[in-house]
């Protein structure tokens, strides 16, 4: 029997369940990571923050955040920060994360928020399936450490 994964708005899911999933998938030490520092003090974009449910049980989440890039020449460029993408450890490699990514990027396009999207993640995976690269991020300064090859972006508006 084939499982049917239901996607829903993240704000329709219990916040404690989301936090517990994030702990299991990413570790309880995740709050000190650079991506968390980047989005500190901002609210997630509701239309781009989704949950995946399997028979009502939370199995994965994705969130996006509005951030800005301040260029050395004074330009301020709005960027959509994608992540975290969290999948229940026992369900990883089931295609749920890829399904969430596709739905999130489609929603970003519909909302006009796909001109500049960034994330920190596995370069082979995110380039192969979604076109993210580190080509334009080498000179970016972030509020914490990051492995440069994992700082990825896509979109015509990426500085």
Where are these regions (language model features)?
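Conserved acetyl-CoA-binding loop-helix of GNAT-fold acetyltransferases
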Residues: 82, 87, 93-106, 119
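Conserved active-site alpha-helix within GNAT-family acetyltransferase domains
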Residues: 110-147
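Conserved beta-strand in the GNAT
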Residues: 49-51, 57-68, 78-86
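A conserved beta-turn-beta hairpin within the catalytic core of GNAT-like acetyltransferases
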Residues: 68-82, 92, 113
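Short amphipathic alpha-helix that is part of the acyltransferase structural core
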Residues: 1-37, 43-59, 74, 151-152, ...
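A short beta-turn/loop motif at secondary-structure boundaries
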Residues: 40-44, 142-145
